[in-house]
Design a protein with these regions (language model features):
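Class I SAM-dependent methyltransferase SAM/SAH-binding core
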Residues: 86, 92-139
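Conserved alpha-helix/loop element of class I SAM-dependent methyltransferases that forms part
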Residues: 64-81
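Conserved Class I S-adenosyl-L-methionine
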Residues: 212-272, 280-286
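A short acidic, Gly/Pro-enriched loop at the edge of an enzyme's catalytic core
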Residues: 138-150
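A short glycine-rich, Lys/Arg-flanked "PGG" loop and its adjoining helix->strand segment in the class I
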Residues: 163-175
Length: 286
């Protein structure tokens, strides 16, 4: 009920959305700053019918295989190796760390609205090609055409204006650069989401409904999520179950029942700058 009330407030007061999410993630980062094993908060990705070991991970990364798999799925939509990459909404830094260590961009920057999350990430993930800083997804603190790739994982639903986010991504991408993008929406919000993508001035290169993959990941990962919630939340473990998407709670039920959908997209800034109203070319990727 508490989680539902929080989401109800967010949906009806977009002007408060940024402040409420920042307060929540500041609280999480401060309360759990000593818990180094929890570095990713997304719902994960798994291929139904495939073994959990379908790609290699270092032993230390294995517990977060499913959230890492979501980053891997989105990151592999276009090359990142040797490129300048920005993650908008880097959270506790685990996704940016995975990309920096496994995919090896020239430069990896993780940006998050929560200063406390940035402090945690900077302390937890130390690498020469990885840097974290605080900033707003709708006012990216970077010069025009600073990055070859931008990645955004399960974060944009928090933003007051998705249009401003897309405009900022378009601004900081170099011509021909990619936005690797994945998120979820309630079923009745999907059409408006598609319209926002269509008017972004970014070309839609690939799109995939990964709802079954996220449902599968949440099912497989529920024992870890449930156990982690009891370790860190104690008497509030039930609320932690809702927040982390344990089987039987609201988000997995909506996803499995068709009330919510989860998509991944690859978008591209036109190789030669074009007006925002330029037509969008698209094809579906299976």
């Amino acid at each position: 009920m508490i989680a539902d009330a929080f989401l109800w407030i967010l949906n009806r007061t977009p002007s408060l959305r940024r402040a409420l999410w920042r307060a929540l993630f500041d609280l999480l980062a401060m309360r759990f700053r000593h818990i180094g094993w929890w570095t990713l908060m997304n719902y994960g990705y798994a291929e139904p019918g495939q073994a959990d070991t379908s790609f290699d991970l270092q032993e230390a990364d294995e517990p977060e295989r499913y959230p890492i798999a979501l980053y891997r799925h989105v990151a592999m939509l276009a090359p990142m190796t040797g490129r300048d990459v920005l993650e908008v909404g880097s959270g506790r830094g685990g996704g940016a760390s995975y990309i920096a260590r496994y995919i090896k961009p020239r430069r990896m920057v993780g940006l998050d609205l929560s200063g406390k999350a940035v402090a945690f990430s900077s302390k937890r993930h130390g690498m020469a090609n990885l840097h974290f800083q605080q900033g707003d997804a709708e006012q990216l603190p970077f010069a025009d055409e600073s990055f070859d790739s931008v990645i955004n994982v399960e974060s944009s639903f928090c933003y007051p204006s998705i249009d401003r986010f897309f405009a900022e991504v378009r601004r900081v991408l170099r011509p021909g650069g990619h936005l690797h993008y994945t998120d979820l929406r309630l079923a009745h919000e999907v059409e408006a989401w598609r319209q926002a993508i269509a008017r972004s001035g970014l070309e839609l290169i690939a799109e995939r409904d990964i709802t079954p993959n996220v449902v599968e990941a949440l099912h497989r990962d529920s024992p870890r999520r449930r156990e982690g919630g009891r370790r860190i939340a104690g008497a509030w473990a039930g609320l932690a179950d809702v927040f982390t998407g344990v089987d039987g709670t609201r988000i997995p039920s909506l996803l499995a029942g068709g009330g919510m959908a989860y998509y991944s997209f690859l978008l591209r800034k036109p190789p030669v700058s074009a007006p925002v109203s330029a037509p969008v070319s698209a094809y579906a990727a299976g």
